[in-house]
Curated annotation (Swiss-Prot):
Binding positions (Zn(2+)): 182, 245, 262
Similarity section: Belongs to the sugar phosphate cyclases superfamily. Dehydroquinate synthase family.
Cofactor note: Binds 1 divalent metal cation per subunit. Can use either Co(2+) or Zn(2+).
Species of provenance: Pseudomonas entomophila (strain L48)
Name under which the protein is recorded: 3-dehydroquinate synthase
Disulfide bond positions: none
Enzyme class: lyase
Entry keywords, A to Z: Amino-acid biosynthesis, Aromatic amino acid biosynthesis, Cobalt, Cytoplasm, Lyase, Metal-binding, NAD, Nucleotide-binding, Zinc
Catalytically driven reaction(s): 7-phospho-2-dehydro-3-deoxy-D-arabino-heptonate = 3-dehydroquinate + phosphate
Pfam family, one: DHQ_synthase
Domain of life: Bacteria
Cofactor(s) of this protein: Co(2+); Zn(2+); NAD(+)
Length: 365
């Protein structure tokens, strides 16, 4: 097992990474103050791991809360089910909410914990690669709104993050690839040597080779923890973690939540960010192509939806959380391994990026 730390002073917490951690109650016990535990999961993950985690937490009074599965259920109505369950079971302020699932479950369970009786303890047990390397770390919680993704939520840090890498054995290949999009992101924004490592180990990662998988998760979590420790509430450097997300969130919203997986939309959005960075003269074509090839090798889509026009993108990006004073800020690459958040770009460059023929770009690789 490896242990990392998210350093936030009195609110610091550990990230445990290893095999078989779901069966180790001694890891969770120090982070549970009361006798009541609510495990929030979904209809897909619960049959696989809920009984196992409930047994590990056998010393506590465990309340299972099983929600419908999918991004389209990340809304007020589903969140209300968590509150209904907690109140019906008379859970008090010393309860601990445990999120068992992917990013949707982690975001909703965390938001429920932030709101319930003005805040109760919260533990992340992510079971998808994307949630293990990204959404479970850093305290972003929330739900979607019909007009925009993750528009209602709170910063609320967990007491601990427990990553059992064996849970990835039940993950569909499409979901695994979606998680690889976020791993690739770390190399692009802050760790250029990591890109070379990923190029050498991509097939091992897709085959769930344990050593490669643990190293990729550790390296990604370490990068995320460092950024969160420096900028918890995304007032500065943390926004660089959103490479590809402004374009990607527009894709998710326009196509309908859940049609494109989050990681898939981020991958296509990252290609657009690479293209715009090249058009600004910040990276060259070989660098752009290198990023696209790596996303392709991960089994990810690298062409935005053909039905989306520049006007569609602009409509959805206008409500992006990085918009300040009416100016759309974008995360772009100054060079491979260095990202910047900027609103200082010619509008015609953005329009050209949105209108680019990505099928032709990919075809010439």
């Amino acid at each position: 097992m490896q242990t990392l730390k998210v350093d936030l002073g009195e609110r610091s917490y550990p990230i445990y990474i290893g095999e078989g951690l779901l069966d180790q109650p001694e890891l969770l016990a120090p982070h549970i103050a009361g006798r009541q535990v609510a495990i929030v999961s979904n209809e897909t993950v619960a049959p696989l791991y809920l009984e196992r985690l409930s047994k590990t937490l056998g010393a506590y009074s465990v309340l299972p809360v099983v929600l419908p599965d999918g991004e389209k259920y990340k809304n007020w109505e589903t969140l209300q089910l968590v509150f209904d369950a907690l109140l019906s079971a008379r859970h008090d302020r010393r309860t601990t909410v445990v999120a068992l699932g992917g990013g949707v479950i982690g975001d909703m369970a965390g938001f429920a914990a932030a709101c319930y009786q003005r805040g109760v303890d919260f533990i992340q047990v992510p079971t998808t690669l994307l949630s293990q390397v990204d959404s479970s770390v850093g305290g972003k919680t929330g739900i979607n709104h019909p007009l925009g993704k993750n528009m209602v939520g709170a910063f609320y840090q967990p007491n601990a993050v427990l990553i059992d890498t064996t849970s990835l054995k039940t993950l569909p290949q499409r979901e695994l690839s979606a998680g690889l999009a976020e791993i690739i992101k770390y190399g692009l924004i802050c760790d250029e040597p990591f890109l070379g490592w990923l190029e050498d180990n991509m097939q091992a990662l897709r085959a769930l080779e344990p050593v490669a998988l643990t190293e990729a998760i550790r390296r990604s979590c370490a990068a995320k923890a460092a950024v969160v420790g420096a900028d918890e509430r995304e007032s500065g450097v943390r926004a660089t973690l959103n490479l590809g997300h402004t374009f990607g969130h527009a894709i998710e919203t326009h196509m309908g939540y859940g049609v494109w997986l989050h990681g898939e939309a981020v991958a296509a959005g990252t290609v657009m960010a690479l293209e715009m960075s090249m058009r600004l003269g910040w990276i060259d074509q070989p660098a752009r192509d290198r990023g696209i090839r790596l996303l392709q090798d991960a089994g990810l889509p690298v062409v935005p939806p053909q039905e989306m026009t520049p006007a569609h993108f602009m409509e959805h990006m206008a409500v992006d959380k990085k918009v300040l004073d009416g100016r759309l800020r974008l995360v772009l690459l100054r060079q491979m391994g260095e990202a910047v958040v900027t609103d200082d770009y010619p509008k015609e460059i953005l329009q050209a990026t949105l209108a680019a023929d990505y099928r032709a770009i990919v075809a010439q690789l």
